[in-house]
């Protein structure tokens, strides 16, 4: 049973990869299907090896680590106006509104654990809305961080790009991975795949008129 499931999964992954190639060549979004976890992980592996404390992955949108979030002077000097902490909480990166109270920084916390069984998807839309609201102001600059800036924070940024920038999961991964070495855990990747399927279905039903389903 397990062997058969593996073969089916690999076959599906190769089929999706072939369809992705066709879509890239012909520009036909109707041929897109959500790739399997292995194919998606390969996209991350092909990305940038760059892994510093913080990297800009989209205009004025940065993914960073705990050290970046704790450096109040550095945040102020860099001009950050918003912070989304994907590892909020006493036993994670324990900052919060009070930590930035004397700074011109708007804070949003997501109390999440970096384990495959944690349901981060319940925060996808609220986190994406916070990022989108911040970036609507041309003078804003947002840091999305967790402990290492690789899994939780990257997952929320990917969800934002999918929800508000009309990207497929593949597009979003390629955008982020070319600027920072990230890799969501398998559980988060599964949740992003489900979001991708939902958004693709909704957009096909809505037609070309509605581009931003996050609103």
UniProtKB/Swiss-Prot annotation:
Extract one GO molecular function annotation from the record: MAP kinase phosphatase activity
Q: Which residue windows are coiled coil? A: none
Q: Where is the active site?
A: 146 (phosphocysteine intermediate)
Segments forming domain Tyrosine-protein phosphatase:
53-201
Q: What is its EC number?
A: 3.1.3.16, 3.1.3.48
Q: Which Gene Ontology biological process is one annotated for this entry?
A: muscle cell differentiation
Q: Which reaction does it catalyse?
A: O-phospho-L-tyrosyl-[protein] + H2O = L-tyrosyl-[protein] + phosphate; O-phospho-L-seryl-[protein] + H2O = L-seryl-[protein] + phosphate; O-phospho-L-threonyl-[protein] + H2O = L-threonyl-[protein] + phosphate
Question: Which residues participate in substrate binding?
Answer: 145-152
Q: Does the keyword Nucleus apply?
A: yes
* Tissue expression pattern: Skeletal muscle, liver and adipose tissue.
- What drives induction of this protein's expression? Deletion of the long non-coding RNA (lncRNA) H19 leads to a decreased DUSP29 expression in muscle (at protein level). Down-regulated in muscle of high-fat diets-induced glucose-intolerant mice. Induced during neurogenic skeletal muscle atrophy.
UniProt keywords, alphabetically: Cytoplasm, Hydrolase, Nucleus, Protein phosphatase
Q: Where in the cell is it found?
A: Cytoplasm; Nucleus
InterPro entries recorded: Atypical_DUSP_subfamA, Dual-sp_phosphatase_cat-dom, Prot-tyrosine_phosphatase-like, Tyr_Pase_AS, Tyr_Pase_dom, TYR_PHOSPHATASE_DUAL_dom
SUPFAM superfamilies for the chain: (Phosphotyrosine protein) phosphatases II
Query: Hydrolase among the record's keywords?
Result: yes
UniProt GO cellular component terms: cytoplasm; nucleus; protein-containing complex
Its biological function? Answer: Dual specificity phosphatase able to dephosphorylate phosphotyrosine, phosphoserine and phosphothreonine residues within the same substrate, with a preference for phosphotyrosine as a substrate. Involved in the modulation of intracellular signaling cascades. In skeletal muscle regulates systemic glucose homeostasis by activating, AMPK, an energy sensor protein kinase. Affects MAP kinase signaling though modulation of the MAPK1/2 cascade in skeletal muscle promoting muscle cell differentiation, development and atrophy.
Q: Which family does it belong to?
A: Belongs to the protein-tyrosine phosphatase family. Non-receptor class dual specificity subfamily.
Summarize subunit and interaction data from the UniProt record for this chain. Homodimer. Interacts with PRKAA2.
**Name of the protein in its database record:** Dual specificity phosphatase 29
Q: What gene name is given for the protein in this entry?
A: Dusp29
